[in-house]
Amino acid sequence: MLEIKLPVSILREDKKYIAYTPVLDLSTSGKDYKEAKSRFEEIVDIFFEELVKKGTLGEVLQDLGWKRARTKWVPPMVISQESQTVEVPIS
């Protein structure tokens, strides 16, 4: 078993909660915060199980920006998460 710290954003959209991690480009939802977090753990487990089963773990993680450090995989570091106001050409 490998333990990895993943950055996770929890968003609320109407009555659903969305859990998203940019380092795996993976998301899931739940009816509340707790369910979104629980489902996130499940989807990460499934994601890694499938990569190992298919033999594509290294390839996919490299494509997502992960680096191999000896016997471990290290995710890219999220250095900022913030709200930014932008103007879009929609009237």
Regions found by a protein language model. Give the residues of each.
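Short, charged, surface-exposed hinge/linker loops at domain edges
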Residues: 1-6, 38-91
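Short aromatic-glycine-(Arg/Gly/Cys) micro-motifs in beta-strand/loop hairpins
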Residues: 4-23
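Compositionally biased, intrinsically disordered low-complexity regions enriched in proline and serine
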Residues: 18-21, 34, 48-49
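Generic alpha-helical hydrophobic packing signal
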Residues: 21, 27, 43-47
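A short, exposed loop/beta-hairpin motif centered on an aromatic-Gly-Thr core
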Residues: 24-35
